[in-house]
């Protein structure tokens, strides 16, 4: 088991080591990152800072121009230790570690901002396994969500356990009205659900589909639109309803849960590969870093209670 884990970490590192992850509000939440416990240490002192972005080989931090840390750097100090900190939502011990790094450059944080600077550091040794694992899982899920966006995962009891889906039965809000439904299959871009109803009255409707996952526990909704209906064989009272998510409303957590299936699944035979083919999910040449796909200005969507109209989802 330890050998398999080591192989996976090496795979993450070799594939994704140079891809920057911007620590947007959503990424911070997804990784259980603890910004208040982050600081940089050098020359016998330590100062709080903000992680702007990080990869498995470097990090960019934000600090004030009047910071004593910046003065140390300008005095010729180039070696530092950056503290990363993560908390556990299920009450386990928190995780923190230092990463040794050297100064690469200092620049203005953003045009017009006279108070903050952006400082780039390069790690002087391979990143800790915990950082490689956390960034690797997130990056693989984000890449798979683009490369495999339309591949459907039929929800069986075994698949539900694997991806952490609490149950197939859930609630879908159709034009703000809650309806009970069953999840038949999922993809990174949508879902197919079964519910009682008349097809003509369910097409082209605004919906929010509610999900509950374990490991870690999370409840959220994804906003989308019904795009197609299909009859259910032997059940005239039921309709199969295809939901297409709005891309900007797909939480990173959803991608990570669903990717638990794709992270070890063999490619289907229909793609021209045998059952023993295990695909390495390498970033495509056109892949945009996580800095862009994960929105920095959208708050996670919280599903509305059943007795109220739904509201909307870094």
Curated annotation (Swiss-Prot):
Coiled coil segments of this chain: none
Gene Ontology MF term list: cyclic-di-GMP binding
Domain of life: Bacteria
Alphabetized InterPro entries for the sequence: PilZ_domain (IPR009875), PilZN3 (IPR046853)
UniProt keyword annotations, A-Z: c-di-GMP
Annotated stretches, region: Disordered: 288-314
Biased composition (Polar residues): 288-300
Effect of inactivating the gene: Mutants are less motile, reverse more frequently than the wild-type cells, and form less biofilm. Invasiveness and ability to induce skin abscesses and host humoral immune responses are significantly attenuated.
UniProt domain PilZ: residue ranges: 146-234
Pfam families, alphabetized: PilZ, PilZN3
Function: Cyclic-di-GMP binding protein that plays important roles in motility, chemotaxis, biofilm formation and virulence.
Name recorded for this polypeptide: Cyclic di-GMP binding protein TDE_0214
Organism: Treponema denticola (strain ATCC 35405 / DSM 14222 / CIP 103919 / JCM 8153 / KCTC 15104)
């Amino acid at each position: 088991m330890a050998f398999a884990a080591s192989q996976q970490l090496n795979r993450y590192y070799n594939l994704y080591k140079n891809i920057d992850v911007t620590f947007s509000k959503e990424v911070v939440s997804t990784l259980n990152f603890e910004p208040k416990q982050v600081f940089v240490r050098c020359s016998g002192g330590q100062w709080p800072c903000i992680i702007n972005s990080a990869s498995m080989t470097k990090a960019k931090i934000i600090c004030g121009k009047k910071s004593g840390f910046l003065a140390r750097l300008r005095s010729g100090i180039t070696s530092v230790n950056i503290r990363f900190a993560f908390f556990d939502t299920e009450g386990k011990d928190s995780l923190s570690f230092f990463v040794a790094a050297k100064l690469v450059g200092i620049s203005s944080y953003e045009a017009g901002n006279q108070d903050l600077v952006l400082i780039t550091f390069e790690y002087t040794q391979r990143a800790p396994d915990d950082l490689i694992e956390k960034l690797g899982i997130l990056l693989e899920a984000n890449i798979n969500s683009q490369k495999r966006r339309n591949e459907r995962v039929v929800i069986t009891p075994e698949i539900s356990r694997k991806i952490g889906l609490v149950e197939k039965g859930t609630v879908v809000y159709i034009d703000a009205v809650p309806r009970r439904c069953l999840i038949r299959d999922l993809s990174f871009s949508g879902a197919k659900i079964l519910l009682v109803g008349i097809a003509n009255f369910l097409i082209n409707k605004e919906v929010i589909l509610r999900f509950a996952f374990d490991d870690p526990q999370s409840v959220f909704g994804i906003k989308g639109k019904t795009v197609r209906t299909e009859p259910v064989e032997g059940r005239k009272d039921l309709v199969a309803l295809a939901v297409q998510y709005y891309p900007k409303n797909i939480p990173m957590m959803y991608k990570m849960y669903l990717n638990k299936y794709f992270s070890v699944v063999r490619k289907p035979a229909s793609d021209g590969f045998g059952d023993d083919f295990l695909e390495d999910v390498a970033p495509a040449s056109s892949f945009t870093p996580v800095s862009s796909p994960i929105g920095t200005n959208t708050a996670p969507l919280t599903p509305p209670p059943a007795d109220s109209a739904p509201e909307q989802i870094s």
